[in-house]
Structure formats: structure tokens, C-alpha cells
């Protein structure tokens, strides 16, 4: 099963979403445990670690999309490794 497409694919999308919803960097990034300065670096095109991308999806996607990602992660963790 393929992983669900994450809601953000670029720093520009993240910044636009944050501004559209009237949040400052501290509010937006704090929801996923990232400092304002860390969020600022991510919004300046620094690579965003996959765990942070996943948290952003869970925090800001619709409930249905968030649940699909969590379900996928749970199944992925419990599926046997091929050849093991």
C-alpha cells in the first residue's frame, strides 16, 4: 500500500497555509513541537525532516487524511519485512 500524499510538498506551501490561516510561526510550528526559529529555517527552504513532515500532515490535514496516514504508519510498522 502506497503512503498517502502529504499535504505540504514545499516550504512555500507551508508558509502560504500558515499565513492564510492567520498564524504566526510560533503558533504554527509550536503545534508540532518545532521552535519559531526552526520553523523559520524550514520556511526558508531548508530540508524538513520526514518526521516533521508527518507531524505537519497529522496536525493540519483534514481528519480523514490524518487518519489515513496514521493507519498507513501503523500497518507499515507491523507488516513483516520481505525475506525476513
Could you tell me what each predicted segment is?
Residues 7, 25, 48-49:
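Alpha-helix N-cap/helix-initiation sites
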Residues 22-40:
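Short alpha-helical DNA-recognition segment
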Residues 64-84:
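Short, charged recognition helix plus adjacent turn
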Residues 1-20:
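A short, Lys/Arg-rich alpha-helix, primarily the initiator
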Residues 13, 38, 54-55:
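A general alpha-helix detector
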Residues 48-69:
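DNA major-groove recognition helix of helix-turn-helix/homeodomain DNA-binding modules
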Amino acid at each position: 500500500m502506497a503512503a498517502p500524499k502529504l499535504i505540504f510538498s514545499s516550504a512555500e506551501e507551508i508558509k502560504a497555509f500558515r499565513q492564510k490561516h492567520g498564524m504566526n510561526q510560533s503558533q504554527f510550528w509550536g503545534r508540532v513541537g518545532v521552535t519559531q526559529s526552526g520553523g523559520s529555517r524550514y520556511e526558508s527552504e531548508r530540508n524538513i525532516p520526514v518526521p516533521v513532515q508527518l507531524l505537519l500532515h497529522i496536525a493540519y490535514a483534514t481528519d480523514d487524511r490524518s487518519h489515513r496516514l496514521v493507519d498507513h504508519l501503523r500497518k507499515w510498522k507491523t507488516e513483516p519485512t520481505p525475506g525476513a
